């Protein structure tokens, strides 16, 4: 959904009626809301999901603290949670559905020295929650920036995720957190920091299917693709029809590639919320150069394409210039095991446990800090 999806309709209605007109639809950026109200003459903007992501959004706007707003991702996690188990959840607000913990927080028995390893969504949330609870925090990130979520740079429809990532990273940098970029955890660093607890948010690596040709020159990982990536030829086969595979397929089709999504199961995108899945399936349906093949198991890759078998064992060929591997993520278990030797109070969050979406990662980071010292 585009920001202000219904704004044009509301502005036109306002021209013909004297009664107040209210519009709604993916509004969350204060400057754009103010500009729309001024230009259109519409009387009011209503917000729903933006206030789930940040219930204090109006107060922050009034006080000029726009940079502190937690932006809504428009991911539908709030709606999907209600449909799934009748409990509302939010990808960026770990308190939603657990409001009693916000107004009556579990007390911190003792302020401790925490070492958070990894600056993705789980690590950033852990650092924010730790500061709120009065702990001393050192956040170590091996790359040159906080935020993770590099795949969000690959597609226009990931703009909300990029905004969340960048604003959350800025929020962490503004807190009394000792942030160390381009840094790995060593014996010397642990001896210097002397952590009482370690929270490992070290993420996961893309996993390649164990089939012949999986390491060929025409194979790239979906999580590592860049926008208009020059490595991608015209005809593309995406191996894996989960959320990442489907979204990569959609974006590649929009760039003009001929794309086939190859999935072993009978349905696509089973790993995302119901509302988001409906949107993804709709995008696949309307994309003219995007095709799907479910119920096929990849058996090999070569320079001409992909070999697969159907449920009956019949072999089928899918020609391709480029194969995009979206077969899943593998937690960095070796790194987790290495870090666990440094501290007896040790927590693992986010993709380092298993493949996670943003909402699960932020809740992991929050929960780990709340459990420190209990």
Identify the residue ranges that each predicted region occupies.
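Local beta-strand N-terminus motif with an aromatic residue
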Residues: 42, 172, 195-196, 320-321
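A short helix-to-beta-strand connector/capping loop
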Residues: 41, 172-178, 215-218, 284-291, ...
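Rossmann-like dinucleotide-binding cores of NAD(P)H-dependent redox enzymes
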Residues: 139-175, 227, 251-296, 353
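Flavin-dependent oxidoreductase catalytic cores
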Residues: 1-117, 121, 125-132, 136-137, ...
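Helix-enriched interaction subdomains in cytosolic or periplasmic regions
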Residues: 73-86, 195-206, 210-211
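Rossmann-like dinucleotide/flavin-binding elements
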Residues: 31, 37, 108-140, 180-194, ...
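Well-formed, non-transmembrane alpha-helical positions, independent of function
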Residues: 12, 35-36, 60, 171, ...
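Short, hinge-like loop/turn segments at secondary-structure boundaries
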Residues: 1-3, 40, 62-65, 155-159, ...
